[in-house]
UniProtKB/Swiss-Prot annotation:
SUPFAM superfamilies: Radical SAM enzymes. [4Fe-4S] cluster binds at residues 119, 123, 126. It comes from Nitrosopumilus maritimus (strain SCM1). The gene is rlmN. Residues 105-337 form the Radical SAM core domain. This is Ribosomal RNA large subunit methyltransferase N. GO terms for molecular function: 4 iron, 4 sulfur cluster binding; metal ion binding; rRNA (adenine(2503)-C2-)-methyltransferase activity; rRNA binding.
Amino acid sequence: MTDLYRLLPEEMEKLVIDMGYDRYRADQILLPLYYKFPKDINDIPQLPKKLREEFTEAGYTIGSAKEIHRVVSDDGDTTKLLLELSDGSSVETVLMQYEPTKIGGHPRSTICVSTQIGCAMGCVFCATGQMGFETNLKAEHIVSQVIHFAELLEQRGEHVTNLVFMGMGEPMANYDEMIRAVKILTHDRGFGLGQRHITISTIGITSGIEKLAEENLQIGLAISLHAPNNELRKKLVPTAGPNSVEDIIKSGRDYFKKTGRRVTFEYALMEGVNDSPEIAHELARLLRGNGSHVNIIPINPTAGDFKRPSEKNVLEFEQILRKSGVNCTVRVEKGTEISAACGQLRTDIVG
């Protein structure tokens, strides 16, 4: 069985030609596939019946995701779904909606997709990391998460504007499937999302960052740093591997030089762990002057023992970075009360 959401447009075109049909038949499949959301090949009536039958006989399917559970935040801006994928596995995906800023802009509908079920990185403050690793997701299963939310938004006259690979799992540990999904979702004959509207987050797998830099894509990169030195980082990310903090920062700089895209360093701020003024100054010395940006994330509640810093400590940490010449922001919180925020995803049904 082959899921049509796995195929790049050029692969779809080759398929129909090899089956003896004109190349335009590929677009007759691709257009409804990404904009009409069919559940079966027979839901595409503009295709000849014979072609639909041949697709079915050859084992081609449309693997849409099935919603198992939905939780919506009190303000209605965040929706978390537990989805059953076409292979029977389950994964969490989140939609975050943002109003236009006071200085302009447009409403944003950002989907946070998962690339794995569980995660092997073992970050001690992350609910997904505490699940352990189960399996990698195929490209079609990553794409189907986006398609499911795209269909929900379309019913409200809205559309997907942004995509972040910040859900369950480490994208760089599933590189080939992740990048195939990116290419499908950004292809002008596929889902058609602009490359600059996508951000991939990584714990700092430098080999993956180097490969991504060579893809000639204009996508954003976010690196989860969480500590300015190797000793502290090893405690927070026990499976960080051979990549030192210095290696990770260098890979971010190299990515910026290669792509021209600013790199964001994610920093989960934890009371009494990595939020002291001394650590803020240490972080500033590492990052100042390299064009990077720090996204400060006051830790979200999980089953662990880590506590969220006081607003005073968060502000002080931010001010130290700013006064040292490091661009930074404190992340706008979305979905914390429904366990849909950073570091909270797992496949339990709660609420």
